[in-house]
Amino acid sequence: MISGIVAGYQVIDVHVELLDGSSHDVDSNEQAFKMAAIFAMKDAFKNAGCHLLEPIMSVECTTPEQFQGDIMGDLNRRRGRIGEIDGRNNICIIKSEVPLAEMFGYSTDIRTLSSGRASYSMEPSHFEQVPPAIVAKLVEQRGGYGI
């Protein structure tokens, strides 16, 4: 489906099996069957309790110890979860998981927070359900689609 039930985002990786149907010589055509399928799927998704998922990134920041607090605070502000913190020779390595949507502009922000002395890397980790408050905001921004 191109326009899903939650904020209009596309529905992916769903298998649908048609169990029964009927046709009529006058009213049955390809477009009518497509519309019936769309309405049936939207109704099924509403009853199933669909969720919006977002990609979560594994983020590793390397920073001088003096900037550790500022960088951890910034990761928390971005809905990040701090995992391991490792320190050696006045350098901290902060491992965290952060939603991809919150990482835009991070390269500029981490340089600003650390006077250009920190670096980071990130890679895809997994998907998680978007928090309800953010779903509500997305629904509002995208024109009122919602469950």
Regions found by a protein language model. Name each.
Residues 1-147:
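Accessory interaction regions appended to the cores of large information-processing enzymes
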